[in-house]
Amino acid sequence: MTRRSIPGPRRAWALVVVATLVAACGGAGSTPGLGGTSPDPGSASGASASPSGVPSAASSGTPPPAASEGPTAAATPGEGEFANPVIDADFPDPHVINVDGTYYAYATTGGGKNLQASMSEDLVEWEMLVDPLPELASWSGLTPLFSDAPHKATWAPAAAQMDDRFILYYTTPALEMERPDGRPSQCIGVAVADDPTGPFVDESEAPIVCQADLGGSIDSTYFLDEDGSQYLVWKNDGNCCGIETRFYIQELSPNGLELLGEPTDMGVANDTMWERNVIEAPTLIARDGTYYLFFSGNDFASAAYAVGYATAEDVLGPYEDAEENPIVATERPAGGPGHQSVVEDEDGDLWITYHAWDVSHIGYQNGGRRAMWIDRLIIEDGTATVEGPTAGPQPAPEAP
């Protein structure tokens, strides 16, 4: 019998995850996220079927804890250095934008807010802000899945600047749109503000997109192409209902509030070992004529959660997975790093932002929280690499 070997990068990723978990668990007991986490009852995939940023009913019946021990740096950073995490609090699914040298980060619901927000002058020191989206659209509301939550469930925000105003895309339940398992679909809304801190207002009467027959639509991000065309990128929430997960792209109207034409399947599916049954959190950038689609895969409440990417020569695709995936994976003390965004600093350097658990406290059911990390993203000769996860001191953004 011929035995197939696992490709080198994926074998290394698997060994890192297993070794880290064995060390974290003392070599005994169940491994969180690798057979030790119960799947959502409504999911046929076996992975967490809850939306990114919100614990599944199976893994946690309560909102995220107010505090727990987060990842800690190995040493104290010196002058011109920093250490992860840069936001040492529960700040899941972080999306960061640069507005004239000031950085704004948006994150999934927490602390009684619909969404969280923070601002920084250097990507390292962050100041927490008020809820940027204090009111949701009329079509949004609580669902049975989130009936115990003290506030409406909103997550995975992504902001963009359009001329003199700001647009915020976010995911929330749409009560009138039933998905195949009979529950309300998770759909994408869009809100507008005059300032990046908000308040963002959503006056729409329906989601900007909601593929209810495909499980719903979540994890949207904005992309501005070099020719001025604007696009919305998202995933269908197929893992809710045993449906294949795909990424989609569709052109936006000039004001960013409507979609034009029809969505295009970007050609990436949850079909590789490291992704297990879930891909999510698409982030699209362009460099030197190549389009890079970053995304996360696997169960977000596990050490197997990681970041990969795919490339294409056309913005609509088809995109092809990089052979070296995943490029950001569990590495002590960062557990299950993912749901990334990419931001360019004032020197033109790229940074990937993502959340990560402390490897010894992965999952809300284990007292964990998802802190925000940043690491350098290097793109050379069509290949993307990340210098991380890095917990120890490293040169700070814009540092000489």
Language-model regions, residue ranges each:
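C-terminal motif of bacterial Sec signal peptides marking the signal peptidase cleavage site
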Residues: 21-24
